[in-house]
C-alpha cells in the first residue's frame, strides 16, 4: 500500500489510522481531508509532521450558509416563528431538516412529551426532576403534526434505530422531494446531499459540539439557493454552551472554529484536546 486518501478525517480514530501500518511498521503516504477540523486534527498538524493546504472557497455550486442562535430562554415567543419560517421555505419549493439530540423514550409521543414545547421556554421543557428535557425524534414528530403552520406538510423521521432498508427508503423519499420536512438525529451528518434542502433547525443545539454543528449545517445550501441554520437553545445566555453556539453562528471557517474549540478546552477542560 503506497498511498491512502482519507476523506472526513475527523471521523477516524487513532486505532483506525494505526491499522494502515504495514507489516514492518511502515506508513503509506497519506492525504487527509476534512471540512471540519477538530482539536485532534490540530494536534496531528502540529506534532504529526503534516503539511497543510487550505481551500478557503466554497465548492462550485454551493451557496453561503447563514447561522443564527434562537435563544428560547430569553425569547420564548420565537418558538412559533421557527415553524412559520419552515413553512416559508417549503412553500418556496424547498425542504427542511429538523435535527434533535435523541431518538425518544417511552412516553415521548404522549401529551406529557408534547408539553416539552408548550411555551417554547424552559418551564414547559422540564421533567419531574427539574431538568430540561431534551427534544427527541418521537416527541418532535408528535408535536409538529399539530402545528397549524405546518398543516399539509409531509413530515418524515430518520434515526439510528431504524434498519438500513428503512433508512434508505426515508432518505430516498427526501431526495425525491416526497418528504418536505425531515426530523432526524445526527445520522445525516455525513454523506447526505440534498441540494433542495435550504433550512436546518437544530433543537437543543447546546447539546452538540462545535465540530458537530459545523458539520451538520453543511447539509443545507448545497444547491442554487442559500442555506440557513437555526441553533435553538433553552440555555441561559451565560455559560460555555451559549459561547459555543455564538462561535458557530459567527463564522463558517472550520479552522477558526477549531481554534475556538481548542481555546475553550484550554479554559474549561484543563487543556485536554483529545479527550480521555
What are these language model-derived features?
Residues 1, 9-24, 109-110, 167, ...:
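Conserved ATPase-coupling elements of RecA-like P-loop NTPase cores
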Residues 2-68, 74-91, 95:
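Post-DEXD/H (motif II) to motif III coupling segment of the RecA-like Helicase ATP-binding lobe
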Residues 9, 33-38, 46-50, 58, ...:
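A short beta-strand-to-loop transition that corresponds to the Sensor-1 phosphate-sensing loop
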Residues 39, 61, 105, 164, ...:
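Flexible, glycine-rich phosphate/dinucleotide-binding loops
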Residues 46, 56-57, 69, 100, ...:
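Pocket-edge structural micro-motifs
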Residues 55-62, 67-72, 106-131:
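Conserved P-loop NTPase catalytic core
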Residues 74-95, 102, 118, 122-123, ...:
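C-terminal helicase module of SF1/SF2 nucleic-acid helicases/translocases
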